[in-house]
Amino acid sequence: MLTRPELKNQSLAMLRGKWTQPVVAALIVTLVSAFTQGGSQTQSATFITLGFLVMLLVAMNLQYGFSVGMLRFHRGRENTVNEMFSAAFKEDYGRVLGLMLLGALFIFLWCLLLIIPGIIKAYAYSMAPYIAEDNPELDPIECLRRSEVLMYGHKMDLFILHLSYIGWILVGILTLGIGLLWVKPWMEMAQVKFYEELKAEAGNNPIQA
C-alpha cells in the first residue's frame, strides 16, 4: 500500500497539465448538488419538493459518474465530463440509481443510531462505485457488500487520507469555494489510487468473501 504522501503526490502528478476536464466535471457536480439545497420561496411546496427529489436523484447519479469518471481518467480515458455523464445516465441508469439510493438509505439508517456509525458505514461503502464499474454483472447490494469487505481494516486509513486535505479545503473555502473545484478531483484521484491499491492487495478480485 502506498503511503498517504505517495497517494497524494502521484494523484497530483497525474492531474498536472490535465485539470480542465476534472475541474469542469467537479463544477457540474457542485452546481447540481447546490441546486438541491435551494428553492424559490415563490413556488408551491409540492413543486419545490418534486424538483428537489428530481435534482437529488440527478445529483446522486452525477456523483457516481464523477467517481467513475476519475477512475477512467486514472486508466487513460481522460475526457472526464463525457465519461461522467456516460457512467451516470447512459450505460446502466437503473443500476447506478439503485446503488446510490441503497447506499444512502443504509447510511441514513445507521445515522439514526448515532452519527459515528453512519460515517463508518459511509466509508465502508466508499468503494462501491468503483466495484460497480469493474464488475458490471453485480447488482447494487453485492457492490455494497464487496465494498464493505474490501474496506475492512482500511476505513480509518481512508478517513485519515481525506483528513489530510483539510488545509487545502480551508484554502478552497477562502477563495469563495473556487479552489475546491481543484481539491475535489485531487481527492477523488487519491481515492481511486487507494482503491487500486486495495484491489491489488486483494489479488484484483474484490471480493468473494
Region locations from a protein language model:
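Hydrophobic alpha-helical membrane segments
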Residues: M1-A209
